[in-house]
Amino acid sequence: MSDHYAVVGNPIAHSKSPQIHTRFAAEVGADLHYHRLWAPEDHFAPVAEAFFAGGGHGLNVTVPFKGAAYTFADTLSDRARAAGAVNTLRAEPDGRHFGDNTDGIGLLRDLQTNHGIDLAGRRLLLLGAGGAARGVLHDLLGEDPRTVVIANRTVDRAEALAGNDHRIRACGFDVLAGERFEVVINTTAAGLQGEMPPLPDDLLAPGATAYDLVYADEDTPFMAWARARGAVTVCDGLGMLVEQAAESFYQWRGTYPQTAPVIEALRIGA
């Protein structure tokens, strides 16, 4: 009998997770079934409980339920605790549920392994201060960047995310003029509406990397902006999606799948 996994969200029909995990399973020879699971916005816990009570082994969690999954989990990884959100739930032998957040490690693996970008000693700018930014900040700080700046339209939110961490400076977009960054990561969802944060034209240092957590068939406005201003490496978030899924797969199965073939297949729409 196949092991049972799912991704839960609302909406959920667009999710690529079933394709990704089905490819991982074929690669490692795992017998599993993975499907999409829709839940009403205020009913995450009952849906998750029913899934696990029915023999489910693990859940991926996407918007808007990462906070609810954090509350649902009985035990948490350090990175989930730092993010205040969970995107991976695992059923434990004693009936409890372990919660992890694989977004940050997924971003790091895409940057480092797939694009050869080392964050150590780099000047890093994080655009946005919402859940996506919080989900990756812990792992980014662990790479010892030289400077970390969080810029957001609402400065209070950036300051709240920075907290008392002396390694981080919080500010609005309007005070970035005259600064240069070697790595700029856009965590806002502006690209989904064909928009981007208001940024000065001279923001990118020579040889800069620009990374948008949004993924699409074409360049997002932020990616197009970065290319036009000389960024050497410009990436969307598809690689991060696959890499965070691989970490979830490892949490469930104890085997780490190859990711490059899956990223390539998704790029060409296979």
Curated annotation (Swiss-Prot):
Write down the superkingdom of origin: Bacteria
> What broad class of enzyme is this?
oxidoreductase
The free-text function statement in the UniProt record for this protein reads:
Involved in the biosynthesis of the chorismate, which leads to the biosynthesis of aromatic amino acids. Catalyzes the reversible NADPH linked reduction of 3-dehydroshikimate (DHSA) to yield shikimate (SA).
* The enzyme's E.C. designation: 1.1.1.25
Pathway where this protein functions:
Metabolic intermediate biosynthesis; chorismate biosynthesis; chorismate from D-erythrose 4-phosphate and phosphoenolpyruvate: step 4/7
Which reaction is this enzyme known to catalyze?
Answer: shikimate + NADP(+) = 3-dehydroshikimate + NADPH + H(+)
Q: Which residues bind NADP(+)?
A: D78, G128, A129, G130, G131, A132, N152, R153, T154, V155, D156, R157, L213, G237
User: How is this protein named in the record?
Assistant: Shikimate dehydrogenase (NADP(+))
Sorted alphabetically, which keywords does the UniProt record give?
Answer: Amino-acid biosynthesis, Aromatic amino acid biosynthesis, NADP, Oxidoreductase
Q: What positions constitute the catalytic site?
A: K66 (proton acceptor)
Q: Which residues bind shikimate?
A: S15, K16, S17, T62, N87, D103, Y215
A single BP term in Gene Ontology:
aromatic amino acid family biosynthetic process
Q: How would you summarize the oligomeric state and partners of this protein?
A: Homodimer.
Q: Name one Pfam family in it.
A: SDH_C
Q: Which family does it belong to?
A: Belongs to the shikimate dehydrogenase family.
Q: Which molecular function GO terms apply here? A: NADP binding; shikimate 3-dehydrogenase (NADP+) activity
Q: Which GO terms describe its cellular component?
A: cytosol
